[in-house]
From Swiss-Prot:
Keyword Signal attached: no
Involved pathway(s): Amino-acid biosynthesis; L-lysine biosynthesis via DAP pathway; LL-2,6-diaminopimelate from (S)-tetrahydrodipicolinate (succinylase route): step 1/3
Entry protein name: 2,3,4,5-tetrahydropyridine-2,6-dicarboxylate N-succinyltransferase
Binding site for substrate: 104, 141
Location(s) in or outside the cell: Cytoplasm
Species name: Laribacter hongkongensis (strain HLHK9)
Keywords: Acyltransferase, Amino-acid biosynthesis, Cytoplasm, Diaminopimelate biosynthesis, Lysine biosynthesis, Repeat, Transferase
Catalysed conversion reaction: (S)-2,3,4,5-tetrahydrodipicolinate + succinyl-CoA + H2O = (S)-2-succinylamino-6-oxoheptanedioate + CoA
EC number of this enzyme: 2.3.1.117
GO cellular component: cytoplasm
Broad class of enzyme this protein falls into: transferase
Length: 273
């Protein structure tokens, strides 16, 4: 455990006593340093290590602590005024800073400080919360939301109105993760630490949380919390044991590899299911 991690862990145990007036300079400096590192992509709340996703809980704790050490203040983006504890990521950016960052942020895109946006990303009018990581080449389409500490991979498309759940409210153990080369269809919601593995296609209007049954049509298996790599998923229903009613589920209708996905458009994958 590094000294800064130990300091964060200790502060989190005392979080009920920490306020903007009582926080020590050392603790405040440590929290600010961690948020700056997350903002710059030097630290991630979750990362894949040896093929498995690992959540760095101490970083999530630092994000939570950051709300304890600041009072609300007036924020002004030139269009409107706001009252919050977290600055916007672009508050003091000039043209040179945007050019160096290498991504596009159109009017209406709101990104909180303490989230990372990689190069070649496009942010339509959308919201990216503190602690989130958005990797290269990703499109965050209009009215999509990337929740606190969510991890979005390379070349992902989050379609209009998509919701990627956060971990802070309500408090979740692990962040929601969308791996590389995934397509999330319009108005879908992926929440509660669900992992959508690489190359998956989620159709429009699919809702997946930890309690959502994920039914594989080919095998008949039911799983929870993880969409296997290369899955094509639509919304559906499964009957009750007595057949008197049915309940919502997500249905894996087929599996595709990267080669097939590269040759076939998203719409084609979702037709003829």
């Amino acid at each position: 455990m590094t000294p800064i991690q130990a300091l964060i862990e200790d502060a989190f145990e005392r979080r009920a006593d920490i306020t903007p007036a009582t926080v020590t300079p050392e603790t405040k400096a440590a929290i600010d340093a961690v948020i700056a590192d997350i903002d710059a992509g030097r630290l991630r709340v979750a990362e894949k290590i040896a093929g498995e996703w690992v959540t760095h809980q101490w970083l999530k704790k630092a994000v939570l602590l950051s709300f304890r050490i600041r009072d609300n203040a007036v924020l002004d983006d030139g269009v409107s005024r706001y009252f919050d504890k977290v600055d916007t990521k672009f508050a003091d950016w000039d043209a040179a800073r945007f050019q160096a960052a290498g991504f596009r942020a159109v009017p209406g895109a709101v990104v909180r400080k303490g989230s990372y946006i990689a190069k070649n990303t496009v942010l339509m009018p959308s919201f990216v919360n503190i602690g989130a990581f958005v990797d290269e080449g990703t499109m965050v389409d209009t009215w999509a939301t990337v929740g606190s500490c969510a991890q979005i991979g390379k070349n992902v498309h989050l379609s209009g109105g998509v919701g990627i759940g956060g971990v802070l409210e309500p408090l979740q153990a692990n962040p929601t993760i969308i791996e590389d080369n995934c397509f999330i269809g319009a108005r879908s919601e992926i929440v509660e630490g669900v992992i959508v593995e690489e190359g998956s296609v989620i159709s429009m209007g699919v809702y997946i949380g930890q309690s959502t049954r994920i039914f594989d049509r080919e095998t008949g298996e039911v799983s929870y919390g993880r969409v296997p790599a290369g899955s094509v998923v639509v919304s559906g229903n499964l009957p009750s044991k007595d057949g008197s009613y049915s309940l919502y589920c997500a249905v894996i209708v087929k599996k595709v590899d990267a080669k097939t996905r590269g040759k076939v458009g998203i719409n084609e994958l979702l037709r003829g299911i």
